[in-house]
Amino acid sequence: MENTEASNLIGMAQLAQLKPTDLRGKTIFIRCDFNVPLRNTSKGLYRVADDTRIRRFLDLTFKKIHELTEGDCRIVIGSHLGRPHKKKDRSGWDGVFNIQFVCSHFDTLVRRVYGDTYTIFPPETLDSHMKDSLEIVAHKRLPPGGIKFLPNLRYLLDPKNTDLYRKEFITKLADIADVYINCAFS
């Protein structure tokens, strides 16, 4: 691939054309569509009720990335989940739309196929301090084979986050990612 800014935008149609050198050792930001239904368990936790979108991503995009890199890459995953809203007392976000529930299920599915090749790093926060979630990647602490889940991307819409904050987050994400793959419209 050409080493231009435009070459960092990889769509599904172009993924098949990539070579190992395009992705090996790189940090890949993947915008996924993991907006999946959740169900409440008897213990008050939530579980993925239908993992079709997650499995489709693993069977297509993730499989191709693994074939090209054999785990020698760093992956940052961003997705939204539902439409989170503030708690009635405005103390924080309703935890129902915590991407952690998706992250746990994703980890289970990845381990079944790839064993310990990949290490999943869940989001640290339920709230909208999303820039903090990029620190592990920005400071090169995400190891090869590391997959970092960002908090629910809809948290960026928190009214306390200014447009400047959102731009800073996007700029920081662009600085750490070598490649962008958009799978959010599958």
Question: Which functions belong to the PLM regions below?
Answer:
Residues 1-186:
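Active-site loop-to-helix "anion-binding N-cap" substructures in soluble metabolic enzymes
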